């Protein structure tokens, strides 16, 4: 099944409601991009424990609850880089929507450390969808991005401001210029 077909299947199974539909779109985009047919690969890509993934996916896509239940029994040890854990902590400290925000915090934290622009790492269609995600789920943090920095650069800068540490993210495009302007 292609990524586009997985996305369509997930969206057909999404819970009704405007804001939930937007959340479902963001999560379905990430899941469709990450899913390779292997539960362990999906869980690893999403950056949460199997039980957490099954819970939030069942919440957003109730018609597929039975399918996601298989993730609960998955024997999988989640591994995360120290920067990813710091980013996740920063994001969850500003999360506003419960289980969905926690999943998105894990996705964003993992995506920041990957090479593509963050919106692409999350499987989104454009940077505007990432902006919406940050405003909706991490409003307090998003409000601090007053210089319109790229999100990877902003989150790395926020980590540095928060705890004085560095973030080893791969910055791309405008993220590079924005980070270079504020990092030192």
Give a label for each model feature:
Residues 133-184:
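Cys/His-clustered metal-coordination modules, chiefly Zn-binding fingers
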Residues 1-154:
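Hydrophobic, aromatic-lined core segments that form the binding pocket/scaffold
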């Amino acid at each position: 099944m292609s990524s586009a077909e997985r996305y369509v299947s997930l969206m057909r199974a999404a819970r009704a409601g405007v804001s939930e539909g937007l959340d479902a779109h963001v999560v379905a985009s990430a899941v469709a991009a990450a899913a390779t047919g292997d539960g362990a690969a999906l869980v690893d890509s999403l950056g949460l424990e199997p039980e957490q993934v099954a819970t939030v996916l069942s919440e957003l896509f109730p018609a597929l609850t039975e399918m996601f239940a298989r993730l609960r029994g998955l024997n999988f040890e989640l591994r995360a880089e120290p920067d990813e854990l710091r980013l996740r902590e920063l994001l969850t400290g500003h999360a506003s929507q419960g289980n969905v925000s926690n999943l998105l915090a894990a996705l964003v934290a993992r995506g920041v450390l990957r090479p593509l622009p963050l919106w692409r790492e999350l499987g989104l269609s454009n940077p505007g969808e990432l902006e919406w995600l940050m405003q909706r789920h991490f409003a307090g943090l998003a409000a601090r991005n007053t210089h319109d920095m790229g999100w990877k650069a902003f989150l790395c800068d926020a980590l540095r401001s928060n705890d004085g540490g560095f973030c080893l993210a791969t910055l791309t495009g405008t993220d590079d210029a924005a980070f270079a302007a504020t990092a030192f």
